[in-house]
Structure formats: C-alpha cells, structure tokens
Amino acid sequence: PRPSPPRRAGAGPDGRPSPLGAAPARLAPMRRAVCPGSFDPLHKGHVEVIARAANLFEEVVVAVSSNPAKTYRFSVDERIAMIEATVSSLAGVAVRPMGPGLLAEFCRQIGADAIVKGLRGGADLEFEAPMAAMNRHLTGVETVYLPADARYTHVSSSLIKEVHGLGGDVAEFVPAAVLRGLDGGA
C-alpha cells in the first residue's frame, strides 16, 4: 500500500478541511478536579457525582462554598465534617472550604484542571453553562458535566431541608452523617 500523503494544517483525518479551521490543540490529561457546592446538606446525589469524579480524576477536591449573603442550616465546619465522614473511603478525595471568592480563582490556587458539576436536567444546564463559560474564560479550567443518577434527579438540598423540617423521612436520600446532623446529633 502507498503511504498516505502528509495531512495539511487544519485538515481532518480524511484530509478534508476541518469544520473548525485549524485543528484544535490536543488537551493535556486532566488530573485534579473540583466538585464545588454549598452542600447544605450533602445528599446522595452529591455523593454519587463525587464518587464518579474520583473514578475519572487522580484527585478530587470537594470545595465547600459559603456566601455571606445566604443563611445556612449547617456551618462550613459542620458541612465539611459530614462530607469527610461520607467520602473518607474514596481514594484521592479531599474536602476543603472555598470561601467567598471566585471558583475560578480557587481552581487556579489549587492547580485544578476541571470543575465537575452534576446535572439533574436541562434547567441545571441552563444555570451552569454561563458560569462554565466564565470560568473557562477566566482561567481556562474546563467544566465537566455528569448527568445525575436517575434515583436522585428530584433531590436537592433545599428539598431535603424542607421535607425533613416538615417531619418527612429523608433517610433514603442523605448519608448517615447528614441524617444525624439533621436530627440534631453529631
């Protein structure tokens, strides 16, 4: 067989021009990801996304955010303790407070390659896409979306707090450490 002619710059594997013009740069492997959130409280949907991220990246930093303009059920330290108790068996996962600054800046400070976000549906994507674009613009950090497990597409921290506050059983949707916290235990 005849050797293939060299590929022209901007050409696809078949030699035709790429629809993107010049061939896109090959991305370096992503090693450290941030799973950000307020996690007030952490629920099993969050845990499932964190566990999947731990299978995709060498390191995952669960960044616990705090906005001074918001009221939280649990302090940052309480949220961190509940998350650590839940994810302690996952290799390569660390939990850190993020503070009130930009997520993009936090990613730059810790050398993160990616932000991992779970999506429950289209509304989540509409909310997350502009933030992902801004984070990429500010630091070049890519956002990786993981679709939520079907068991948890209806679960949110706000709904957990509301249902629990009205006496409903949320044990199926939160880790044991969170249930103890919601019930007033440590």
Task: Name each model feature, range by range.
Residues 1-26:
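Compositionally biased, low-complexity flexible segments
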Residues 24-186:
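Nucleotidyltransferase catalytic core that binds NTPs
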